[in-house]
Each structure stands twice: as structure tokens, then as C-alpha cells.
UniProtKB/Swiss-Prot annotation:
It comes from Escherichia coli (strain K12). Optimum pH is 8.4. CDD domains: CBS_pair_SIS_assoc, SIS_Kpsf. Residues 42-184 form the SIS domain. This is Arabinose 5-phosphate isomerase KdsD. Transmembrane segments: none annotated.
Amino acid sequence: MSHVELQPGFDFQQAGKEVLAIERECLAELDQYINQNFTLACEKMFWCKGKVVVMGMGKSGHIGRKMAATFASTGTPSFFVHPGEAAHGDLGMVTPQDVVIAISNSGESSEITALIPVLKRLHVPLICITGRPESSMARAADVHLCVKVAKEACPLGLAPTSSTTATLVMGDALAVALLKARGFTAEDFALSHPGGALGRKLLLRVNDIMHTGDEIPHVKKTASLRDALLEVTRKNLGMTVICDDNMMIEGIFTDGDLRRVFDMGVDVRQLSIADVMTPGGIRVRPGILAVEALNLMQSRHITSVMVADGDHLLGVLHMHDLLRAGVV
């Protein structure tokens, strides 16, 4: 394309708004295609014993990849297969237990129509998403989902715009309808997103990140305040637990308690930890979610908390541990 000068006064915002208006109109019309065929497609996918295999060429392929990823992360096992690669061996990934979703706006993708006889021979259920109910793919499908649009947002009518948006939204409608039908929960979602922020919040538990063993700051009730302070500084958690030989909790002493001791104006050299500790103390169970511990710590304005089974000390959790784990 040769260099073109920008037209004086060209309004980019208006051009963008025109696209949104056209695509909004097309999506509103899509509602009529959420019909009995949509129900049949959902039922085939719901009862599928294998995986939902999505296919598409070009822009439809890009939409198909996103569709498969959305299905997979919302409780419907799925993957994308490129039709060209399927014709050269990758079709071996498809079994009669699977369901195939083939996407083509024209419904005449030669790469896909070439695969249909084989899919039929394998008795693989076929759902086709096209913009033309009279197309070859629509007629060959066990279930046809229509995504016909009045016009593309591209003024030339060439670049897939409204049609790809409609297809993407139809895929989202399938995914979310199935999600609801399965009773899919946020915890289920987290299992397929362990590396994300949501996964960390819904999967990570206190016992995954707490300090244990020699890392736990603790002294006996008979210890001097000086010895307790040394333990606080050695373990660097801003606190120490006071417990007996069996690690049964008797109290806690934090850097906040130390400030209060100084405010008392007493001779700290003469004090035992029993004189200044807070009896009992807040503790959490090791099996609770890390985000639950975070909420507790924030509500109580504390930076560390004991982890215990009843009165038996198991570990200590500090706010820094939650930060490092990405929970905060």
C-alpha cells in the first residue's frame, strides 16, 4: 500500500464509535439464535465423555483457540486443532467420545469440509458455527449454530469484525451456560488457574507458607524479657510465642507489646516474659485458606499470627509470607 496522507479533521473517535454501534446491533440480533439448537449443542457438550475439539481456519481459528481455552478453564475439557494439520495426522487426536465444534463464517471452509466425511465415519458429533444456515457445513452438522450478522463493521465488508465478535460471543454463551449447568465454582476455576492471583487466593493454605520447626520464635514462660527479645530478633518475625516443653501455647509477645512496656517506665532488666506477655493470643488453624488468615490479620491490625491445633503450636505466619506468596 502506498503512503497515504491523513485526511484533515479525520475523527478517529467517531470511526471507533461507529464500529461499536454496528457490532452492538449485530449482537442484539444474535439473541434469536439462542434457540433449540443452542440447547442441543449444550447437551452434546455436557454429556460428552471425551473432549470438545474446536476447529477453524484464519480468523475463525483465532476465535476457536480462545473458545477452546474458555471451555477448558470453565469445566468443559477442550482443545483446538488446526484443520490443515488435522488433515495430515492431527485428526488422530479426535475420538468418538469427543464432540467437534467447527467454525467458519461462510460455512464453506474447504479444509473443514474435507474432514467432515471422516468425522462422520468416526461417529463424532459435529457442531458447526457458521453465518450461513444453507452452507455445506450447516447442512452436514448434527447441530448448527447460526451467527449470521447484517454487516461487518469494516466499511469494505471484507475484514471479519462483526462476524468474529458474534462467533466469540456464541462461544462465551456456550461456555457460561455449561458452567452454570455443571455448578462450576470459583474453587473449580482456581484448580485450572493455580498460577494466577485467583488460584493463589483460593488454593493456598496457611500450612503451605507458615514457618515451622526451628523457624518458630518461642520461649518458655520462665524466660527473662531479655531472652525473649533475643528470640524475637533472631527469628525476625516481630514476635515470640510463650509455650511449654510440649509446645502448648501460654501467650504471645510482639514488638507492639515491647513498645507498651517501654511506655510503662519500668526497668525491663528485671522483668520476666510472664510479666508482660499477652495470655492466649490469636491463632489460626493450619488448613484454612491463606486469604482467610490475611483477612483476620488485617481486621485485627496484626502482622503475624500463631498457627495452632487448639493450644498446640504448629507454626507462625507473618504478613511478609503472604506478600511473598502473592496473596496480598
